[in-house]
Amino acid sequence: MEAKEKKYGEIEIEKAQLEAWPNPNPERDYMIEITFPEFTCLCPRSGYPDFATIKIRYIPDKYIVELKSLKLWLNKFRNRYISHEAATNEIYQALYDLLKPRFLEVVGDFHPRGNVHTVVRVRSDENYG
């Protein structure tokens, strides 16, 4: 059997790292909202694919996330066996550690499977309303 040559997109996703850029307006509080509607990962129990929309809201301090790096990094989850809760928390923690924002919220809105719809919300304050 021949070894399959990786496509350029697979290579880019494989080596993806989150990148921080300087905030152009650190003197001001402003909200950045990012939606990633094509998030996928694999159920650690069944191996079936899970699909979600990942919503990220944050008030930056010194840094903002570079969007292409975020897109490629989020795509790294597509072949990982990881629960909804673990995926959402990992995304939150990676962004929090990288950016150290004034506020951060990550929401994993997972498509229903087996008639169950799961929304996981992680945020840097205690207002979960």
Swiss-Prot record:
Signal peptide: none
Superkingdom as given in the UniProt entry: Bacteria
Keywords: Cytoplasm, NADP, Oxidoreductase, Queuosine biosynthesis
Binding site for substrate: V65, E66, L67, H84, E85
Keyword Cell inner membrane: no
EC nos: 1.7.1.13
Cellular compartment(s): Cytoplasm
Molecular function (Gene Ontology), one example: preQ1 synthase activity
One GO location term (cellular component): cytosol
Active-site residues, as the UniProt record annotates them: C43, D50
Reaction(s) catalysed by this chain's protein: 7-aminomethyl-7-carbaguanine + 2 NADP(+) = 7-cyano-7-deazaguanine + 2 NADPH + 3 H(+)
SUPFAM superfamilies noted in UniProt: Tetrahydrobiopterin biosynthesis enzymes-like (SSF55620)
GO BP: any one term: queuosine biosynthetic process
Keyword Transit peptide on entry: no
Family annotation (InterPro entries): GTP-CH-I_C/QueF (IPR043133), NADPH_dep_7-cyano-7-deazaG_red (IPR050084), QueF (IPR029500), QueF_type1 (IPR016856)
Pathway: tRNA modification; tRNA-queuosine biosynthesis
Disulfide bonds: none
Family named by the database record: Belongs to the GTP cyclohydrolase I family. QueF type 1 subfamily.
Function summary: Catalyzes the NADPH-dependent reduction of 7-cyano-7-deazaguanine (preQ0) to 7-aminomethyl-7-deazaguanine (preQ1).
PANTHER family for the chain: NADPH-DEPENDENT 7-CYANO-7-DEAZAGUANINE REDUCTASE
Protein name: NADPH-dependent 7-cyano-7-deazaguanine reductase
Gene behind the chain: queF
